[in-house]
């Protein structure tokens, strides 16, 4: 039984793809017109899609007419990849390929010496690789320096013009004490209600040149006596007539120059501090590299000085001087009172400043008005401000005595 002729013609009909349907024929150039072709586009036309090198012994697929090197496409078919690497058309075997000597002749016409072309390509690749590596290294270094400078500018805030290298850790904006006269004025101002009589005793070493924390607290201790706090007032004298930066242990190296200043409000913990004990709000301005331990030690020293000043202010002229009224006009009664002071009540010892430690007080922060968080003593104020606060107003901290200082 024979197949009808129309059925045979239908099976041989070539089905055009959408791309082929929209193709338009190009007119052949018959004159001597020359067209400039860039080496990059020419190389892409003469390149094997498998090895990305110039075609060698060109083989063309019979169905999709894509060109490959003979070794490349044969190796691909032997590995079991029975499809065109470019368009995924099915390739049964080597019988689906045909040689393309015309394309090899075209390549030979453009590049007569293939060995010279390959040597030139190797030299170009080596030079490009070397220049690219150097340029990448220099650009990476420049980018790193630029990023470091940007982060440094964001983190370091320049201090105000005319400010001291170490900020005063006393409250307010008062002038530092300049000598004994200033210390006496502060002491007299802090105790306006005291009865006239002998001037209150001043601790030794409170002269104009005293700047140590242990013995030079007399000029500043009186500023916090009674209910009025020197930290919240305008009489902002500093310890020992000098300035009080972050306290540091004896023998420690001097602190670096501050990159910026931080203002903070120091309040007693509303839950852990009993009312009336020392419910003073302190306004402190210090450097950003001061740590939480510095604040704790400053607070312990400050409160010890306040208690010492209160005891000195309320203390009489002598332990037993008020008990004798038989003294002569030359003030001998005072000496008898002192001599007989053993019979009166024993005077309480003044608080010592030698045992002051940063472990006596714990610093807390309540970010966003939430729960209180205990701050680690090694954290700097700049890090606390960036990590917990993140608002453009003075840093607010709370303090409370440590339950079990060690």
From Swiss-Prot:
SUPFAM superfamilies from the UniProt entry: RING/U-box
Broad class of the protein's primary localization: nucleus
Family annotation (InterPro entries): RAWUL (IPR032443), RING1/RING2 (IPR043540), RING1_RING-HC (IPR042741), Znf_RING (IPR001841), Znf_RING/FYVE/PHD (IPR013083), Znf_RING_CS (IPR017907)
Source organism, top-level taxon: Eukaryota
Stretches with biased composition (Pro residues): 246-258
Region Disordered, annotated ranges: 151-263, 309-354
Region: Necessary for interaction with CBX2, residue numbers: 230-406
Positions bearing Phosphothreonine: 24, 215
Ranges where the record places region Necessary for transcriptional repression: 30-234
Enzyme type, top EC level: transferase
Acidic residues composition-biased segments: 175-187
Reactions catalysed according to its record: S-ubiquitinyl-[E2 ubiquitin-conjugating enzyme]-L-cysteine + [acceptor protein]-L-lysine = [E2 ubiquitin-conjugating enzyme]-L-cysteine + N(6)-ubiquitinyl-[acceptor protein]-L-lysine
Location of this chain's protein in the cell: Nucleus speckle
Motif Nuclear localization signal per UniProt: ranges: 201-204
Record's keyword terms, sorted: Chromatin regulator, Metal-binding, Nucleus, Phosphoprotein, Repressor, Transcription, Transcription regulation, Transferase, Ubl conjugation pathway, Zinc, Zinc-finger
Phosphoserine: residues carrying this PTM: 38, 140, 187, 190, 229, 232, 248, 254
Biased composition (Gly residues): 214-228, 235-244, 317-343
Zn finger (RING-type) location: 48-88
Any one GO cellular component localisation term in the record: PRC1 complex
PANTHER family per the UniProt record, alphabetical: E3 UBIQUITIN-PROTEIN LIGASE RING1, E3 UBIQUITIN-PROTEIN LIGASE RING1 / RING 2 FAMILY MEMBER
Subunit structure: Component of chromatin-associated Polycomb (PcG) complexes. Part of the E2F6.com-1 complex in G0 phase composed of E2F6, MGA, MAX, TFDP1, CBX3, BAT8, EUHMTASE1, RING1, RNF2/RING2 MBLR, L3MBTL2 and YAF2. Interacts with CBX2 and PCGF6. Component of a PRC1-like complex. Component of repressive BCOR complex containing Polycomb group subcomplex at least composed of RYBP, PCGF1, BCOR and RNF2/RING2. Interacts with PHC2, PCGF2, RNF2; CBX6, CBX7 and CBX8. Interacts with BMI1. Interacts with MN1. Interacts with USP26.
Function in brief: Constitutes one of the E3 ubiquitin-protein ligases that mediate monoubiquitination of 'Lys-119' of histone H2A, thereby playing a central role in histone code and gene regulation. H2A 'Lys-119' ubiquitination gives a specific tag for epigenetic transcriptional repression and participates in X chromosome inactivation of female mammals. Essential component of a Polycomb group (PcG) multiprotein PRC1-like complex, a complex class required to maintain the transcriptionally repressive state of many genes, including Hox genes, throughout development.
Name of the molecule in the record: E3 ubiquitin-protein ligase RING1
Gene of this entry: Ring1
């Amino acid at each position: 039984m024979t197949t009808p002729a129309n059925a045979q013609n239908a099976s041989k009909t070539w089905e055009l793809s959408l791309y082929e349907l929209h193709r338009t024929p190009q007119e052949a150039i018959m004159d001597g017109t020359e067209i400039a072709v860039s080496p990059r586009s020419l190389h892409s036309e003469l390149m094997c899609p498998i090895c990305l090198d110039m075609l060698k012994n060109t083989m063309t697929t019979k169905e999709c007419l894509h060109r490959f090197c003979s070794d490349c496409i044969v190796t691909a078919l032997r590995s079991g990849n029975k499809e065109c690497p470019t368009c995924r058309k099915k390739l049964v075997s080597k019988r689906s390929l045909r040689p393309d000597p015309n394309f090899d002749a075209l390549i030979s016409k453009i590049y007569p010496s293939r060995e010279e072309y390959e040597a030139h390509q190797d030299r170009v690749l080596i030079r490009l690789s070397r220049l690219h590596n150097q340029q990448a290294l220099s650009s990476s270094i420049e980018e790193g320096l630029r990023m470091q400078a940007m982060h440094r500018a964001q983190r370091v805030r320049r201090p105000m013009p005319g400010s001291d290298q170490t900020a005063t850790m006393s409250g307010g904006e008062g002038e530092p004490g300049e000598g004994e006269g200033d210390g006496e004025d502060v002491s007299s101002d802090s105790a306006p209600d005291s009865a006239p009589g002998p001037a209150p005793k001043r601790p030794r070493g409170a002269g104009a040149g005293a700047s140590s924390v242990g013995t030079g607290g007399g000029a500043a201790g009186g500023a916090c006596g009674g209910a009025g706090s020197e930290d919240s007032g305008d009489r902002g004298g500093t310890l020992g007539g000098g300035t009080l930066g972050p306290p540091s242990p004896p023998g420690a190296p001097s602190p670096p120059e501050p990159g910026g200043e931080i203002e903070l409000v120091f309040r007693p913990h509303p839950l852990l501090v009993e009312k009336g004990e020392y419910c003073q709000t302190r306004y402190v301005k210090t450097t950003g590299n001061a740590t939480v331990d510095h604040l704790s030690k400053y607070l312990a020293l400050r409160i010890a000085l306040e208690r010492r000043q209160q005891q000195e202010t309320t203390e009489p002229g002598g332990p037993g001087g008020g008990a004798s009224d038989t003294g002569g006009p030359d003030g001998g009664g005072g000496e008898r009172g002192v001599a007989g002071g053993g019979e009166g009540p024993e005077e309480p010892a003044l608080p010592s400043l030698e045992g002051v430690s940063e472990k006596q007080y714990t610093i807390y922060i309540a970010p966003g008005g939430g729960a209180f968080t205990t701050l680690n003593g090694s954290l700097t104020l700049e890090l606390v401000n960036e990590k917990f606060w993140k608002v453009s107003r003075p840093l607010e901290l709370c303090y409370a005595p440590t339950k079990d200082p060690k």
